């Protein structure tokens, strides 16, 4: 079953799904902007197109992730994103 979600007045949209070999995950697109997301459980985020500038919990500096690059977010935390251009991603819930 697919679950469609929309955040930040429609600037971020995702489709959640569950599949063999991947488990629970979502794919989505973020429009340009700045966002803060909270996590319930650990997440693995992979950029598909575009780029994400990310400030992870406890990190002193922002990091830029481009297509094919992955970052991990601890559960029960918040992380900040700066998005310059429309960017697609895959999020796996660990």
Curated annotation (Swiss-Prot):
GO MF annotation terms: guanosine phosphorylase activity; purine-nucleoside phosphorylase activity; thymidine phosphorylase activity; uridine phosphorylase activity
Signal peptide per UniProt: none
TM ranges: none
E.C. no: 2.4.2.1, 2.4.2.2
Alphabetically ordered keywords of this record: Glycosyltransferase, Transferase
A single GO cellular-component term on record: cytosol
Reactions performed catalytically: a purine D-ribonucleoside + phosphate = a purine nucleobase + alpha-D-ribose 1-phosphate; adenosine + phosphate = alpha-D-ribose 1-phosphate + adenine; cytidine + phosphate = cytosine + alpha-D-ribose 1-phosphate; guanosine + phosphate = alpha-D-ribose 1-phosphate + guanine
CDD domains, per database record: cupin_PpnP-like
Disulfide bonds: none
The protein's enzyme class: transferase
Protein role: Catalyzes the phosphorolysis of diverse nucleosides, yielding D-ribose 1-phosphate and the respective free bases. Can use uridine, adenosine, guanosine, cytidine, thymidine, inosine and xanthosine as substrates. Also catalyzes the reverse reactions.
Family (UniProt): Belongs to the nucleoside phosphorylase PpnP family.
Classification via HAMAP family: Nucleos_phosphorylase_PpnP
Name this protein carries in UniProt: Pyrimidine/purine nucleoside phosphorylase
């Amino acid at each position: 079953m697919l679950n469609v979600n929309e955040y930040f007045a429609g600037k971020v949209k995702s489709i959640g799904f569950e599949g063999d070999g991947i488990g629970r995950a979502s794919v989505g697109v973020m429009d340009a902007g700045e966002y803060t997301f909270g996590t319930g459980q650990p997440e693995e985020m992979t950029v598909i197109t575009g780029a994400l500038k990310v400030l992870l919990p406890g990190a002193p500096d922002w990091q830029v992730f481009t297509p094919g690059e992955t970052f991990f977010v601890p559960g029960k935390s918040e992380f900040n994103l700066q998005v310059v251009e429309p960017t697609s991603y895959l999020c796996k819930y660990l």
